[in-house]
Amino acid sequence: MRLSRFFMPILKENPKEAEIVSHRLMLRAGMIRQQSQGIYSWLPLGKRVLDKVNAIIRDEQNRAGAIELSMPTLQSAELWQESGRYDAYGKEMLRIKDRQDRPMLYGPTNEEMVTDIFRSSVKSYKDLPLNLYHIQLKFRDEIRPRFGTMRSREFMMKDAYSFDLTREAAEHSYNKMFAAYLRTFDRLGLRAIPMRADTGPIGGKLSHEFIILADTGESEVFCHKDFVDFDVPGEHTDFDSVEGLQAIFDKWTSLYAATSEMHDEAAFNAVPEGDRLSARGIEVGHIFYFGTKYSEPMGAKVQGPDGKEHFVHMGSYGIGPTRLVPAIIEASHDDNGIIWPASVAPFDIVVINMKAGDQACDDTCELIYAALSKAGKDVLYDDTDDRAGTKFATADLIGVPVQIIAGPRAVANGEVEVKDRKTGARETMTIEAAINRFVA
């Protein structure tokens, strides 16, 4: 992508409405624009990051055996009345009526709808276990939306819903998602700590929030410091192994970790003083096991091996991609801008032409741009006629992991400079060596 043809409306000044680093940098880098209170457009740079976040989420959901579907954003109020949540949910839910004056709602979550899909299609235990997920825009009318897309009214969620015959089987499905979430956040460059959490309006018997530690976090959290160094489940994790997944769950829940809502001061004080960690955190995922809370009132049941009908045991598992993007920025930035993990960076490499219009610089940059693009790299080519300082500031602000800088003096010697955005390390090398480093 040539920067001269890319839509990336950079802001030179810090926006006054931004309270936290991620909101400020997302606005300055031209990733998002606010359309109304708590509602944002995702501009091309931001959407590239969001798409890569979603790709990792999908990959890990598929690996764990979940199956993707798509459900509508508008839902019938009848389903929510059936579950008993229509009146209980409160003013966060946007209620509307269609032209026939039928009550509808803009879904804040999808337990009722997916249960309706299940009960109309699945009748036998032989079709279990089943885990269905989707990634969708949702709306909750927050009283005080703030921090950009960290806490907005319209937001994107990955929701998965598991269906099992027994509690034991449902707990295995829960453990699958538990391990999948650990892997997902690790691939996104985040260290997420699972903490026992309140079930809130979703309800249920078991719940964990996945929290990343950050000074700007809204929640106060308390945990054992060893969580920071725990090994995440590997790529070859067997998601069919009951014992293996239970061992992962047991390890990651063996030490004290709780949000402020579930905090037990006495239990925390039992942790050796040098091992206690009190901090602020950002919730990036939430999983629930709620048994038959929805299946019983909505009649979601299957015939078991005993020939009798059984209400299915359910779980739900949420990750907010539009919340994850600012969370990643909160965890990885410096005074100059964003430092993206390679897995979600909008571009892999930015090629900076220090003197656009200079034939040697132009030819060198075109050569590098073409070679890296052909090799499958996402490359941003800064071919603008901006001053060198502006180009460097832009590259640092948007956080592309690698900068390849071509200036007249270096190019005259057949060389370019390669800069690592995270470490700031610079290395001069031949043009061929620079290409080969990222093509090989």
From Swiss-Prot:
InterPro entries found in the cross-reference section: aa-tRNA-synt_IIb, aa-tRNA-synth_II, aa-tRNA-synth_II/BPL/LPL, Anticodon-bd, Anticodon-bd_dom_sf, Pro-tRNA-ligase_IIa, Pro-tRNA-synth_IIa_bac-type, Pro-tRNA_synthetase
Enzyme class: ligase
Location relative to the cell: Cytoplasm
GO biological process: prolyl-tRNA aminoacylation
CDD domains: ProRS_anticodon_short, ProRS_core_prok
Quaternary state and interactors: Homodimer.
Family to which this protein belongs: Belongs to the class-II aminoacyl-tRNA synthetase family. ProS type 2 subfamily.
Reported function: Catalyzes the attachment of proline to tRNA(Pro) in a two-step reaction: proline is first activated by ATP to form Pro-AMP and then transferred to the acceptor end of tRNA(Pro).
Classification via NCBIfam families: PRK12325.1 (NF008979), proS_fam_II (TIGR00409)
Protein name according to UniProt: Proline--tRNA ligase
Organism per entry: Rhizobium johnstonii (strain DSM 114642 / LMG 32736 / 3841) (Rhizobium leguminosarum bv. viciae)
Record lineage: Bacteria, Pseudomonadati, Pseudomonadota, Alphaproteobacteria, Hyphomicrobiales
Gene: proS
